[in-house]
């Protein structure tokens, strides 16, 4: 499980935008159709109020319709639903198509009159028969959604087209919309873009919004993300929440416009305050992570909650993460995290399904249930979560929740790799190299591991090195003699693993080069290999000896002492402690330091190092770096002699005979 929260990356937001543009997230809904009122007669809309009232009072039905409309929306006059209903009724009773349309709209909205969709649809039909474009458009919306009449999207499309051809911008929008979604008529993005362009040119924000989708996705028109951003800006100025949301996503991700997190946050806020759940979630992200807005975790979590209450699966997932980790001011609560992840998963959130799978697999917040974990991973994979294939592969490989099935494991790792998941590439490459679920394919496996590393999965190189090292060791152990051809392959395996950073492989390559195993002797190259493996105690000792004895390099006792001391201090190696003590005692690689020399000799002697016991015995005999003590000298020399040290035995014999000793 993650140790900390991370914001959605820009690339993920582009994906979120594409998903939003193909969902109902940015659709305005039915009522917005009745906000698109279309063109009124230029004559009537241009009359001043006094002239209009005089004509209406004189019984002019068209003037009555216009006056009704102005009273209904408060245009140039105080808004008065009652006056609107009175004038619209008078106009409609006079047989005026415009009056019938306006009265129908009032009945539909319940403005000044009880809401009555059936009567509204009847009046729209009367107006439509007289060729009134608003009546046609509004009747089309009723037919589209089955409000006040039987739903008939095909008939709605025909009415929208007829009204659009008469110049109705509102009808152009609706017809373009039906063409875009293929509702009641064959989907045709090209026709959709053409009709939406007519409506957008007349300033209809909803048309600008949908046309922007066409431009952004290249549907029915050439892809032009900059042009899409321009249209969303126009629609956002008109206050369209979905346009604010889409524009915010583009600004956040720098798609079609220069990235501007502060501006993005502003548009998310505008859309969020209009009730758009996706915008609430992203505004929460901005506050939680301080992206384009002041960092305010409490405010961010509050927006997450509001978004979750409105059904945002992303917000539910993020709140689950907060509770699982006990961050963002929320108590650690595995049960609440599971509840939120379940809610998100029910809406198709694939990563939430993975989290639930993890919980059941490892018993975090719920009873461990491997088969159920497997089912959740499978669900996540079916919803497009490429990483889920890795977890499925692990379960099948190790028999978690199912019998062991290396072939199925390999198939899932391959699916993850083909989907571009770096972890999947690494696991697939490992299986190819190790022959899991298939015969070993070393070249293909190595190539896949390198591809995984290039894609950002750094552990892939470690796996490559491990696989090569293991094979190299097997070949080395299986070799029958010095001429075995497997030795050359072993050397190559060690070389590849060493280049990938495997220290033990670098050491083994050095050993092969030093002894001519599977390769000609090259002490200088061996030294460079030991240097790569210098974190290992054996490599430190090899380096020290190479420099001390001048094997393949110029003799350098300073460097030799350095590596002896490194091995002695870091690994407490008896030979290293003896060698460091010897050099310090005799002034090799550093000025003589008998006390320090005796210190290291004593440490090595206590570990049973015979050479150190011999040198320590001599030091005690002569008082070199320590007080003179025949008892201690005899003790250490006897220990060395028992360990097979000939010099110690000879010295003890001479002591016994009383001969002169140096």
Provide a role label for each language-model segment.
Residues 8, 642, 646-662:
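Terminal, low-structured helical/coil segments at or just beyond the last alpha-helical repeat
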Residues 9-12, 29, 44-51, 464, ...:
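Structural recognition of alpha-solenoid helical scaffolds
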Residues 29, 57-60, 73-75, 80, ...:
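Short helix-capping/linker turns of helical repeat alpha-solenoids
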Residues 35-36, 66-73, 102-109, 136-145, ...:
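Hydrophobic face of amphipathic alpha-helices that form TPR/SEL1-like repeat modules
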Residues 39-46, 80-81, 116-117, 152-153, ...:
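Helix-turn-helix repeat elements of alpha-solenoid scaffolds
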Residues 443-457, 530, 534-535, 628-646, ...:
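TPR/TPR-like (Sel1-like) alpha-helical repeat modules
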